[in-house]
Amino acid sequence: MVLVACGTRPQQPAAHPDWSYNSVVYEMNVRQYTPEGTLAEAARHLPRLQEMGVDVVWLMPVYPIGVKERKGTLGSYYAISDYEAVNPEFGTLEDFDRFLAEAHRLGLRVILDWVANHTSPDARWIEERPADWYVRDSLGNTIVQYDWTDIAKLDYGNADMRAAMAAAMRFWLNRGIDGFRCDMACEVPIDFWQQTLPALRKEYPGIYLLAEGEAPALHDGAFDASYAWELHHLLNDIAQGRKSAADLRAYVARDAAAMPREAFRLMFTSNHDEN
């Protein structure tokens, strides 16, 4: 479960949706949320989440997973083969639409995990789009980052790829979602976010945009909120006696000095990277 704790509203109001102030965000892993691992079954639990006080459901990636270089038998949600489809393991687009409709009926918001840095090595884009949509080595092979051997990094020097990424985001916004949690946001050039996100806000007023990242620049005309990673680890250290309230005071002052006043900070108890 994740908490978004935001302080007082800025004197010059930012373009944050009213519903996002002090909202409680619940991260949902569809595969593991119910024994069936489907959107249809997960939707049955939405009333319970509402009763718990959840405001926003953040769905981990629901898109098809690549097969090539797949890690394990099920693969990683973050090795996406098609940005505009639902993983058949979870159901269909119609199941997704019903999940979204039920959430909205209950007054809940739904944001999707968005992986803009890379796709799977056998993604539809690799098969159908020009080679220069991807970063390649001297031999023409797509490249991986870190130990992510199941991905291919996208090339943000390509204007057509950027436009297609924005169009894929619109695909889901047209279905009625309430925003995105953008995976590894700092790995994507900031100018892409600064160009794309304001345009999406104009077309879809009231959307909420969360960055997995902690760089102040993410708030420069781009995201509503960013991760408070440092605070999460600091609070764990305080709970275990390794740090003190003085360290917390120092963090609050340091973060306030570094971040724009209107920036929302995602203060979380846990997430899929930490649990």
Question: At which residue positions do the language-model features occur?
Answer:
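Short beta-strand segments
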Residues: 27, 56-61, 180-183, 210-212, ...
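Active-site donor-binding loop signature of nucleotide-sugar glycosyltransferases
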Residues: 30, 156, 229-231, 270-271
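Short, solvent-exposed loop/turn segments at secondary-structure junctions
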Residues: 31-33, 64-65, 116-117, 178, ...
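Active-site-proximal helices and loops of the catalytic beta/alpha 8
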Residues: 100, 167, 178, 183-265
